């Protein structure tokens, strides 16, 4: 409690007596409750005598208390029902700030919507009357200018006029822009402009248009006309032209990289070097070659010659040394976990199994096995198969994770501590002896999330599992104790995807909060936060060398991030819908992305260019994967179809002819590269996985 006593000995006499009376009543109340130290201190500070205090009656105290309590109630009421001058003071400040922000959309007080519409109409006529060689590039300016004029009309309060303007001219635009325009038409108040993601993004970054120098010169000459001043102002504030020398692009080439909310990527977005090569593998020969025995001393020189011992033969599979890749990062570029002996043995086993791999081609397609989840009343939201193809994990809408064994071996749990102490730790099969045979089960459930599970991911060593959920958390599960060992919190919205690094230890997640985050299993804080997407990040994937992470977003872009610096080193545009799936090629140079727009795009990470677009699916492409030898690309989606593409021919044509967006082939990619299509029986695909021997495993959900 604080007490103001500075006016006791001065000021107005009436006010003095009133204040002193209240003070005496307070002292009387303190004395009543026997707060002696407080009473003495206050009497000394206020210079009050005991005689003055004795003159105050109990009724005086009650009267003052009633007045104080009444004033408190009045103050509380005034907080809810304030006077017109004060009641909306805070909201007035907010409205003033909003008005100031909205004023940015309108250049002057004499705003004339008709003037802007007439300017756009003339621009549209100019584009239509242009020569065919320039028309397609010039038409790319219509969408961003149309949207900016709509913002200005809506900010001026003319909602119906703004809606009428969009409805009148939206037919000029390509179909992939209609979805964005439909969302903008839902804006009903000028203030909603300040909260819309697309509006904020277009205010912060300029819309990028790639255009030949000749096309750009024609456009500049047109907007220099006095009647085009309003268009020229929009162009200078909100558009960025990335010009190049050479012929203007045709319709196909313009559409190939269009579709993003902020246009195409700038050249400087893809200029940084990317070390896409693979890291040098460990020398496995040292794991299998026994240590040389110490040489015996030859004491008797006259003794007959002893037979020489034969040197053990080297395994030709293991003696192959991997060549150093000039495009690979240094082994210490990012700190990678040191391989334990058990990890090396797992890699050795994988290498031996890979030696029996089937070489795939158009004449020798992979065999495919389809796992169908039946009677899943909880709803299957995701599925993942372990790298050694022995386990299947599925996430469900009821927040559970369920794991099945795909082999006769059952899922066993760790023995108790007393039994573990009795084991010989030097035993070669210690990993098997640690598990209790009596606890074996075909399937196990993991409970802990409080929302639908959107992704599961096995660790490379197959003893850990990651899961992410709508509850904004990521959980790390032990597949030895079948329990949650860590809960990672950092995202503030649902987490859509999570992936382990190929070398283990690190993992990456992405969320509705427009970010992706890099984590380490031994830290509950994110190591890197990748910020740059304009909408939620839907999918994520680790590069085979663990130095980079790819993300796909609802802003229709694909980005590549450097784990060491946290910077975006590639920005790739071309999708016409949210990016739903990603996969790196076995060599690390290429990235495939699937989308809600039904398309699959192949990207070259060396320069960020679009290699080709694969058109065959009729619905969202939910999952993509490459064969282990990198020759076949498998894709599947909600259209219940599995497609196999000749990726070897894609790269062969690209390298030999260097087909780029500027020189796009006229042939139908479906006819050239599609190897085979396999339909499922009313079962959308959830996951695809190639085994080490190139057997294709599919997981789907049967819809009755």
UniProtKB/Swiss-Prot annotation:
GO terms for cellular component: nucleus; transcription factor TFIID complex. The keyword Transcription applies. One of its GO terms (biological process) is transcription initiation at RNA polymerase II promoter. WD repeats lie at residues 376-405, 448-478, 490-520, 532-562, 574-604, 616-646. Residues 287-336 are annotated as: Disordered. The keyword Nucleus applies. Belongs to the WD repeat TAF5 family. This is Transcription initiation factor TFIID subunit 5. The lineage of its organism: Eukaryota, Metazoa, Ecdysozoa, Arthropoda, Hexapoda.
